[in-house]
Amino acid sequence: EIRDLADVEVNFDGITYAKGASVLKQLVAYVGEEAFRDGLRAYFAEHKWGNTTLSDLTRHLEATSGRDLTSWVADWLETAGVNTLTPVLETDAEGTVTSAHIEQTAVEDWPTLRPHRIAVGAYELQDGALVRTDRWELDVAGERTELPQLVGRTRPALLLLNDDDLGYCKVRLDAV
């Protein structure tokens, strides 16, 4: 509960603002830039000079993106904690990926597994430098999200989850 400005100063710090910015960036990635922009235009046009609620905004974003944001709002705005994403790759003797997925975990005190829209980058060493050779976006949902894009390919030198920093999550590197 926030009773006065002193409570605001105690509850809103650099971490809060940074997380807020990251959650907004995640929302843009989740609904898509064009849908987000179109939703904001419709929202501002309908509510100019008026007061609004969060549901007014999400209604417009749902209409332009086609995504139901009810569970997204509950998971991202009404729960604490941060999820950890870990890539799990298996390869054969030649280094070809035979299976690949992302494991999502949460801490025991805040067990919510959130939906994430992230970019995944595959990197190779070229002339002594890491160079991104492939990138794709995908939705991470639940405990396990498959990465079929990697199966049948040579294991990359680096597989970077949340490449381009679209999501608010901890990222672990694979075991290699």
Regions found by a protein language model. Give the residues of each.
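Non-catalytic accessory/interaction domains
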Residues: 1-3, 13-15, 20-38, 45-176
